[in-house]
A protein has these predicted regions:
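Extended soluble regions of mature proteins
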Residues: 22-232
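Positively charged n-region of N-terminal signal peptides that target proteins for export
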Residues: 1-4
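Sec/Tat signal peptide C-region and signal peptidase I cleavage site
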Residues: 17-21
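Bacterial N-terminal signal peptides
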Residues: 6-15
Length: 232
């Protein structure tokens, strides 16, 4: 699966930057897809303190990352619940029996974005290709850092529940992707596209920097029941 030249050229045409003097954050739009379902749009709103992801509505459900406290909240208005994940803790270390390799390649023919040549990364575990990404180094750093923090928090939570995960699911790709190298691409750049061999795909459609953000987007609703994630 390739991130085509035409797709990158299209992205270059839709990128724009706000000139509002009250610059506070970045908004990104990705097309995301799981195996067997149609792609859907996801909006990521990033500030210095928070990252919110939703499907574009200020009123619907959303996922909120408190960056300083390393806490994740998944808000579901339909049943008035908030799933809480505590992302604090030590990142799990790669066990000796698991070999994790990150392969890196550059195609100079691909158009540059923000002056940088996109880089292709491949996550390989025990010689099996598990995940691929095309990233842009040194661009949209605040958003990249927030996405990495989110991935790390989920990795810590996954490590707490690993013992309850059936052994047949604990494949080298599962372990590397969700525990030991979940941020393999996010530590190097903002993803233009990432995908797995099982049908997951996420592709950057558009972004806007210098956005005046509504603080209310980062507030949890009152009166919702909080459910603690397992493992705590």
């Amino acid at each position: 699966m390739k991130f085509t030249l035409s797709a990158l050229s299209g992205l270059l045409l839709v990128i724009y930057t706000a000139v509002n003097a009250g610059e506070k954050g970045t908004v990104l739009w990705y097309a995301e897809q799981e195996a067997g379902i149609e792609p859907y749009k996801v909006r990521y709103i990033v500030s210095r303190e928070f990252m919110r992801s939703d499907e574009g509505s200020d009123e619907g459900g959303f996922v909120l990352l408190d960056r300083a406290e390393q806490q994740i909240y998944s808000v579901v208005p339909q049943n008035r619940t908030i799933l809480h994940i505590d992302g604090r803790g030590e990142l799990p270390q790669v066990p000796p029996q698991l070999s994790v390799e990150i392969k890196r390649s550059i195609d100079e023919k691909v158009p540059r974005l923000a002056g940088q040549v996109p880089v292709t990364l491949e996550l390989v575990a025990n010689q099996e290709l598990c995940y691929s990404a095309i990233i842009v180094p040194g661009h949209l750093e605040q958003a990249r850092a927030a996405l990495r923090e989110f991935a790390q928090a989920l990795s810590i939570q996954q490590s707490r529940t690993l013992a309850a995960t059936p052994q047949e699911y604990q494949t080298p790709c599962f372990l590397s992707r969700y525990l030991y190298a979940t941020d393999f691409h996010l530590k190097q750049g903002i993803p233009l596209v990432d995908w797995s061999q099982q049908g997951h795909r996420r592709e950057l459609l558009d972004y806007q920097t210098g956005v005046e953000l509504d603080d209310g987007l980062f507030e949890l609703p009152d009166g919702f029941a909080t459910i603690e994630a397992s493992g705590r």
